[in-house]
From Swiss-Prot:
Name used for this protein in its record: tRNA uridine 5-carboxymethylaminomethyl modification enzyme MnmG
HAMAP family: MnmG_GidA
InterPro entries named among the record's database cross-references: FAD/NAD-bd_sf, GIDA_C_N, MnmG, MnmG-rel, MnmG-rel_CS, MnmG_C, MnmG_C_subdom, MnmG_C_subdom_sf
Example GO molecular function: flavin adenine dinucleotide binding
Biological-process GO terms, alphabetical: tRNA methylation; tRNA wobble uridine modification
Protein function: NAD-binding protein involved in the addition of a carboxymethylaminomethyl (cmnm) group at the wobble position (U34) of certain tRNAs, forming tRNA-cmnm(5)s(2)U34.
Gene that produces this protein: mnmG
Family: Belongs to the MnmG family.
Keyword Cytoplasm assigned: yes
NCBIfam families given in the database record: mnmG_gidA
Subcellular location, record wording: Cytoplasm
Length: 621
């Protein structure tokens, strides 16, 4: 390795979803970036389920895409099954989800990484972080190679101190067949960083040729034309169906009879697993009254017989896994290709991080993905993007992107993590966002791409596409300002009262019985059937509700503008109880708005902090 490979601006450790987004985001910003991976050939591999998106998660994917990220483009290149979840509810909580061909997804990520300017892939195990005082200055590889950088982003996934469990078997590793980052984990514990352990798991992989598909309920792809990335012109792959079966009393009996052989119940694993993706043994133990649990049989690709049984993550012994599977309809003769297993791993206490995902007490050290206590590809990708952008802004001496709970699900997630911490793997849900009417999956581009362009992390193709989109948006906006009378509505066959008067088309769209395409004869100069037209129509429909939030948002913005120093002396605030001092000192919120979201902090305490910040400001002036 020549000296040119030794010196970088940013070093990203780990080639999973967080690492890829962090490295590519930093490189798009123009800084020299190294992506360090155990095995570069595995960069972009899907460790668990072959799917991208879902409830809350689809919002994150679209937001990462708005910054010209990788995950949505790769998912579209690999998509073989599409579902828009929550379609029966309002569009604010719709969840776009695609099932991906693993090989195609991996190939798409590899191609994007290989062609990304300013990005160098470095093979090797990171053995240690290098420091000067309290600042990280680089990393050392297991072979002794030293790489220097102004920032290091740890995206270690489940590899940091990873252990794999299957029945009585215990193996060292972060993923089956791959080693764990044990030396780096030892160093981080030695640095007395706030660390803990969490657990996740994966189901067995099945041989699809041994499944009786005719005995299963079919779940077809949705047949529409939406995609995850705004830059994807159309769906490109054949679409397949998934099968649905259920666990049953016989399968439950097999599981119950062998709970003592599960590491979750034998005491081998004491780390907490994900609440919203429990193992099948956990489901049977906690929900013993249920007569069955759905299992979605998802083909892993177009040219493979592997099938992913979504819903039965397990670490039971192999013989028990096979027995419970063969008790289910359609699986009486199924064969296992790879048994399921659980993985326990180290993570950072996320309250030790800033809103830019930098460790508060270590300059230049960032963390993203499962190392921060989250679960899921989409959560990891979003954190990788945020860490990469913030680290690049420090290198370039630019202001970091201003994201808050009213502008993105990404900021909701980071705010939840850094203020509340985790006691179990965190996953994104639409219910976590109090401003979700503003944060629809289909308006991520409008919300975030202008900021992305301002930051300089958007490529030429997306910038040109966005400029054309804005021209179309302006024409649609002008059309929505057109006036129409109740009689004109009735002439179109729309059920409105004669005394409704004359209104702008955007106001007529607030009527639940009127859709934008219904108004096409009134505005022939625009296409009312596009995704962009639907987005603007939804903006119009939600406008009265959003207006009611405006005062609340103004207060949020004002409080976000009041910053609190990392060493803010809460103990010196007059009238602040010892409990409030303890809570605020532990959380170390960066703004007054963040202080208000610390659990247990009262409005009175917040007012006292505000008064004290103003006094400090006057004294310093």
């Amino acid at each position: 390795m020549g000296r040119a490979m030794h010196d970088f601006d940013i070093l990203v450790v780990g080639g999973g979803h967080a690492g890829v987004e962090a490295a590519c985001a930093a490189a798009r910003m123009g800084v020299r970036t190294a992506l360090v991976s155990f095995d570069p050939a595995r960069i972009g591999a899907m460790s668990c389920n072959p799917a991208i998106g879902g409830l809350g998660k689809g919002h994150l994917v679209r937001e990462v895409d708005a910054f010209d990220g990788v995950i949505a483009r790769a998912a579209d290149a690999a998509a073989i099954h599409y579902r828009m979840l929550n379609r029966s509810k309002g569009s604010a909580v719709w969840g776009p989800r695609v099932q991906a061909d693993r090989k195609l997804f991996h190939a798409a990520v590899q191609a994007i990484v290989a062609t990304q300017e300013n990005l160098t892939v470095v093979p090797g195990e990171v053995a240690a972080l290098r420091f000067e005082g309290a600042r990280v200055t680089g990393i050392e590889l297991a072979d002794g190679t030293a790489l220097s950088g102004q920032a290091v982003i740890l995206c270690t996934g489940t590899f940091l101190g990873g252990k794999l469990y299957r029945g009585e078997e215990i193996m060292v590793g972060g993923r089956i067949g791959e080693d764990s980052a044990s030396r780096l984990a030892e160093q981080m514990y030695g640095l007395e960083l706030p660390m803990a352990r969490l657990k996740t798991g994966t189901p067995p992989r099945l041989d699809g040729r041994t499944i009786d598909w005719a005995a299963l309920e079919e779940q077809p792809s949705d047949g529409e034309d939406w995609t995850l990335s705004a830059l994807t012109p159309a769906r490109s792959n054949p679409e397949i169906f998934c099968g649905i079966t259920r666990t049953n009393a016989r399968a439950h009996d097999i599981i119950r009879a062998n709970l003592n052989r599960s590491p979750l119940f034998s005491g081998a694993i004491d780390a907490q697993g994900p609440r919203y993706c429990p193992s099948i043994e956990d489901k049977i133990h906690r929900f013993g009254d249920r007569d069955g649990h759905q299992v979605f049989l998802e083909p892993e690709g177009l040219d493979t017989h592997l099938v992913y049984p979504n819903g039965i993550s397990t670490s039971l012994p192999v013989d028990v896994q096979l027995g419970m599977l063969r008790a289910m309809d359609g699986l009486f003769h199924v064969e296992l290709v790879e048994p399921g297993y659980a993985v326990e791993y180290d993570h950072i206490e996320p309250r030790a991080l800033t809103s830019g995902l930098r460790l508060k007490d270590v300059e230049g050290l960032y963390c993203a993905g499962q190392i921060n206590g989250t679960t899921g590809y989409e959560e990891a990708a979003a954190q990788g993007l945020i860490a990469g952008l913030n680290a690049a802004c420090v290198v370039l001496d630019r202001e970091a992107p201003a994201l808050d709970r009213a502008t993105s699900y990404m900021a909701v997630m980071v705010d939840d993590l850094t203020l509340h911490g985790v006691s179990e793997p965190y996953r994104m849900l639409t219910a976590r966002a109090e401003y979700r009417l503003r944060l629809r999956a289909n308006n991520a581009t409008a919300r975030l791409t202008p900021l992305a362009i301002e930051l300089g992390c958007v490529g030429g193709e997306r910038a040109e596409w966005f400029a054309r989109r804005e021209e179309k948006r302006a024409r649609l906006d002008a059309a929505l300002d057109s006036q129409a009378s109740a009689k004109q509505m009735q002439d179109l066959g729309l059920p409105v009262k004669s005394d409704s008067g004359k209104m702008a088309l955007r106001e007529w769209l607030r009527f639940p019985t009127i859709d934008f395409p219904d108004l096409a004869p009134l505005v022939p100069e625009v296409d009312t059937g596009t995704e962009l037209a639907a987005e603007l129509a939804e903006d119009a429909a939600y406008a009265p509700y959003l207006a009611r939030q405006d005062a609340e948002l103004r207060e949020l913005k004002a409080n976000e503008a009041i910053t609190l120093a990392a060493d803010f002396p809460f103990a010196e605030v007059p009238g602040l109880s010892s409990e409030m001092v303890e809570r605020l000192t532990a959380a170390r919120p960066e703004t007054l708005a963040a202080a208000g979201r610390v659990p247990g902090v009262t409005p009175a305490a917040l007012a006292a902090v505000l008064v004290h910040t103003r006094k400090r400001g006057r004294a310093a002036a």
